[in-house]
Structures are given as structure tokens and as C-alpha cells.
């Protein structure tokens, strides 16, 4: 993996070559069971290896859900470290879905864990939560810029209970979610595409994305509402770097590597056709 290219360049090149689908690696206990794997770090390792074999070279971006590894403690983290390393060595971009959020030196330590070259968990990008204020993410954004990595900030999530908070009005006008979009847009004028947004693939996200230039990670495809055919309309302002994320609908095809790969490539092609 060349680290001399910016995150933006790497993302654009990967998407041009292998489409915009982002596949989740979510070793949910029920999935381990469905794949006939033990609910242990050993089962986790096999699950991750099957996913890697299925997705490398076929999809541009893979998003491991950190919680499902963390639940097995250090053994689970060891599996995650190996998985992230193998994916990145193979040229697949990795978004660590860790949703970290904190302030000052603590935020910086999280950023060091997920974005610093040489860190065991070093990924191409990490998801972060702006609940402590967008500016609390400063250390992570600075580290991302320094190392040509990306940060995806939660703006409007696809879970129904997010609405009350995310649609709440700011004293300055506009919704909380829109304020995150606007802050990300402003930051990207300085550091192109460093700040991505997480915006759920729902028809009613209610955001004005017309002023935002950068990647959008859009979870909730299929399982939580929006279909592939909805994407072009819902995200018309930011289709170029839209990364629709699907985990369940693809992983349901496992444990066969052939079936997993077929599910991913079919969805990838449907997404590309829908966004054309």
C-alpha cells in the first residue's frame, strides 16, 4: 500500500477500480452460529479469514465492526489487528468502525491507535462521534491529515432513536446533524476529503449536502430501509464518493467464500448501476 498518496486519492482510485460498495465485517454471535463457527476468538479468526478471502480484490472498502472483536478481549483485538493488516497489505481500504469520541489527549490517543502508521490497528480511516462537539475531534483530524488517513464523523444515523437528538435545532439555527455536515464541509475546504460523514441510507435524512464535498459512508442499505434504487435520489449531491455500506445482506450468504464473493459483487454492480 502506497502511503505517499492522499486518502482522497487512494479512495478515488479504489472506487474507480472496484466500485463504491463498503462491506462490513460484522462477526455477530448469531452469524458465527449460522456459519457453524464457535463463539470464540478462534471462530472470529475463521470468520474474518473467510471475509478477507471473499472481498479482497472485489470491493474497494471494508469496514470491520470493532465491537464484535472487542467482545473477545485481547484475543479478539489480535484477530482484528491481523485482519486489518492483511486487508491493507492486499490494497483494500479499511474503515475501522470504532465510533470513538473524546477530547484532547484522549481523543489523540484514540487517533493514534487507529490512524498512526506502525500502530497495530492502523487503518485507512476510523469512525468518530462528535457528541462532545465537532471541534473535540481536532486531534483526530490533524493526525488524519498528517498521515493521509480519513475520519468519518457521525452526522445522521439510520437508527430511529437518533432522530430526536440529530434533528434537534441548534441555537444558531439548523439541526444538530446539519451543523456537523457544515463543519465537515468547512474543514474539507482546507484538507480535501479528510472528513467523511456517516449518513444513514434513509429517505428522510433531512440534510442539505449540496455544500459538502467529501466521502459519505451510508449504512443501513437493505436491512434498515433504503434500496439501491433510492441512493441516487437520497444522495444526489454526493454520489461520487458515496460508500453505501451493507453487512447483513452480504454476510448472510456465508460461510461459502464463493457465495460471499458473489453476494458482494452482485450488490456492488447493482449500486454502480443505480448511481450511474
Cite the ranges covered by each PLM segment.
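Conserved anion-binding
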Residues: 27-29, 98-196
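Active-site-adjacent beta->alpha loops and helix N-cap segments on the catalytic face
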Residues: 71-86, 103-108, 132-145, 202-210, ...
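Glycine-enriched alpha-helix->loop->beta-strand junction motifs that scaffold or abut catalytic
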Residues: 17, 59, 117-124, 145-151, ...
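A C-terminal functional module that forms or caps the active site or interfaces directly
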Residues: 197, 201-245, 249-250
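Active-site-proximal loop/turn and secondary-structure-junction residues that shape catalytic pockets
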Residues: 27-31, 66-70, 100-102, 130-132, ...
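Acidic (Asp/Glu)-rich catalytic clusters
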Residues: 15-16, 52-58, 82-89, 141-147, ...
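Conserved, mostly hydrophobic/aromatic
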Residues: 23, 62, 97, 126, ...
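Conserved N-terminal beta1-alpha1 strand-loop-helix module at the mouth
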Residues: 2-65, 69-82, 86-95, 172, ...
Amino acid at each position: 500500500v502506497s502511503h505517499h498518496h492522499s486518502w482522497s486519492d487512494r479512495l478515488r482510485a479504489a472506487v474507480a477500480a472496484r466500485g463504491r460498495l463498503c462491506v462490513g465485517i460484522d462477526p455477530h454471535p448469531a452469524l458465527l452460529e449460522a456459519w457453524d463457527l464457535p463463539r470464540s476468538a478462534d471462530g472470529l479468526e475463521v470468520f474474518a479469514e473467510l471475509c478477507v478471502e471473499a472481498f479482497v480484490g472485489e470491493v474497494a472498502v471494508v469496514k470491520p465492526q470493532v465491537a464484535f472483536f472487542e467482545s473477545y478481549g485481547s484475543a479478539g483485538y489480535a484477530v482484528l489487528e491481523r485482519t486489518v493488516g492483511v486487508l491493507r497489505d492486499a490494497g483494500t481500504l479499511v474503515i475501522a468502525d470504532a465510533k470513538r469520541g473524546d477530547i484532547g489527549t484522549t481523543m489523540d490517543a484514540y487517533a493514534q491507535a487507529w490512524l498512526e502508521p506502525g500502530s497495530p490497528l492502523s487503518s485507512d480511516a476510523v469512525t468518530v462521534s462528535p457528541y462532545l462537539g465537532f471541534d473535540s475531534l481536532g486531534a483526530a483530524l490533524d493526525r488524519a491529515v498528517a498521515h493521509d488517513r480519513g475520519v468519518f464523523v457521525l452526522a445522521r444515523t439510520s437508527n430511529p432513536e437518533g432522530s430526536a437528538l440529530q434533528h434537534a435545532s441548534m441555537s444558531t439555527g439548523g439541526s444538530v446533524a446539519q451543523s456537523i455536515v457544515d463543519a465537515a464541509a468547512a474543514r474539507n475546504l482546507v484538507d480535501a476529503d479528510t472528513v467523511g460523514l456517516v449518513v444513514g441510507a434513509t429517505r428522510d435524512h433531512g440534510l442539505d449536502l449540496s455544500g459538502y464535498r467529501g466521502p459519505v459512508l451510508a449504512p443501513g442499505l437493505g436491512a434498515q430501509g433504503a434500496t439501491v434504487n433510492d441512493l441516487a435520489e437520497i444522495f444526489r449531491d454526493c454520489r461520487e464518493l458515496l460508500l453505501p455500506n451493507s453487512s447483513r445482506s452480504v454476510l448472510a450468504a456465508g460461510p461459502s467464500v464463493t457465495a460471499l464473493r458473489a453476494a458482494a459483487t452482485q450488490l456492488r454492480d447493482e449500486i454502480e448501476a443505480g448511481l450511474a
